[in-house]
Amino acid sequence: MSTVAAPRFYAARLVGTSVFDPIGDSVATVRDVVVVPQTRTSARAVGFVVEVAAKRRVFLPITRVTSISPGQVISTGVLNVRRFEKRTGELLVIGDLLDRAVTFTDGSGEATVLDIALDQNRHRDWMVSRLHVRRRRPGGSFGRLVSRGETLTVELSAVTGLYGTQAEQSAHLLAAAYQ
């Protein structure tokens, strides 16, 4: 019995990738991934911020994406050119979550988020699943300049603080529910 690995992409590696329509014409470039936190340990991708001609950033819903692979994103070709505006409850992976400090749940210290992996589940939703982090070294500021901590990829459940503190996240989700 063989198992097929779920499709996965890393957000920071996808930035700068061309978005193609079904006939192969390049229509945009990926600039960010928009996610909506579901719980403390999950977030669902709802789309991409893409850049079209004249540096205009627009929203491409994930439902209009037919394929994501290294070097290319293929869409249905339908693109709304209204300027992107972040809504309440949405987070940008590159703009909001990268370089965020997180704490390991096992008490082994803190880390900085370098990249975020999204996996496709059986319902075809893209969910945040793993974080590529750099462990922070204890010590003064000079120690941080000289040596870097180790990098590792961990499950989302292995850290806390990605979406803010519990109080910040609760207030954020409550405000989103009323709008």
Feature roles, as predicted:
Residues 1-179:
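Peripheral interaction segments used for macromolecular assembly
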